[in-house]
């Protein structure tokens, strides 16, 4: 039975963890870090790169480097934004191109192709999958993936689609704050009520949970899927653009390369200001005009940054109030406040959380790793590796249907424990109505038009009758992933129609399967490319060492071997000029064999010319070499 990994698919960074020996372990990437930037790029050679490599080349390739793709997951152009920034406005902030696809889907452009957000997320998941396989030494095909608690149905489905495209069977979608609570509370024996304040790179969640005897029960959750570290960075970027325009009269917002440099500088300055009082933002050659190159050099203080982002921190407290109210708890009843997400390292955030809850936040967990660890624990629960853990999560948003007058009628209210099922009987609005449309909605607004459409389907074949007579039973079923299926049944005829809300990510089953095949093909290409690079590196190093051997030992190498070695080196250099990996491997092997022959010949020659050594006497006296000191050799 293969390992099931836990994945924190983040806006800024992602992580993968696994249970080993009964303990969760965060897996390092091929580059050696447990934090993998959620960045994907296509470079000038048309190669796809993911993670640290992609982030490192972003300044030189801003238009083909995609980051913060999580903010576009499950979103559509022109949809009601709620607390979120409309897609159109968010797209304008990005140096890469975001376009409108079929059915108002969001697409991002890299190279000469456009991709859906689940496809881009799948590339990040493939990187995590590959790193996990290299670490574990076995194939990884199953995963538990975390999402913000406040993700709606479409965003959750988009995440499942991303997993499928990456070749992963997603056993469970788990809320990020719940995962953090699992990691925090797994070894806790006493009953506690905790608040998980999760401010990540792109999203904010607050969850109130009761912990006790291995049971983790979510009492309420609230949040904002468009509030996170990205927004803090954007405040600094906007300030830098305004200051530079005021000082130099140049608008850097029109320059995509400059924007990418500003983003990296803003993120760096923000991180530094968590530990120091001021930092210098120095960007030489940021732009140029008729007078020549221009530089940017500005001092940013912690107090100035706090003034800039105060509204964002305050914005996070409104969902906290909502979550406390929904849970029926007061801040005094919260035993611990757990901080999750890199943005919670900011002193202002910690102070505001302390002021709100009236207690010092718990800093005993790693805010970057705790979600992935919780996902790995949940994976262990599903596989039977972790016992005596019961997780009771909730739905974040109310689910209902549209009824007469465009009203949204709730069937399952927010913060209902899942899995769950709820039925309600409705009737027709007109005499002899032959069919009804079931319009499935998600959201808290009283009118259907202001909520998100999850799906529509028709129930036909209703027998002619006066309005209000037919009885149509509508049933909502939600599984443990928070995924919804809806059934409508005419109680008079027994006729029923069912819809599972699976295409709300904007991708059909066929599209997901096609993308999966493409992703698999790319994985094969990536493996071949890696194999070629490794073969080239081995060949180049061997040729270099062979050339050095020739230079250093020319007088000691027999003439015929000298000629053979030169010939083999030339063959390797010629093979390296082309793209035939097998030719590179073949010539490398031949050169290696030739080098071994040279080594044998040189050492053989040295031994022939060496004087015979006398045996030491029984008394242990030294022979001819007076510089030799006797001593014992002891293995340690």
From Swiss-Prot:
Induction: By stress conditions e.g. heat shock. The keyword Nucleotide-binding applies. PROSITE patterns: HSP70_1, HSP70_2, HSP70_3. Residues 602-636 are annotated as: Disordered. InterPro entries: ATPase_NBD, Chaperone_DnaK, Heat_shock_70_CS, HSP70_C_sf, HSP70_peptide-bd_sf, Hsp_70_fam. Keywords: ATP-binding, Chaperone, Nucleotide-binding, Phosphoprotein, Stress response. CDD domains: ASKHA_NBD_HSP70_DnaK-like. It holds the Pfam family HSP70. Residues 618-636 have a biased composition (Basic and acidic residues). Gene3D superfamilies: 1.20.1270.10, 3.30.420.40, Actin, Chain A, domain 4, Substrate Binding Domain Of DNAk, Chain A, domain 1. One of its GO terms (molecular function) is ATP-dependent protein folding chaperone. The modification Phosphothreonine is found at residue 203. Belongs to the heat shock protein 70 family. Acts as a chaperone. This is Chaperone protein DnaK. It comes from Dehalococcoides mccartyi (strain CBDB1). The gene is dnaK.
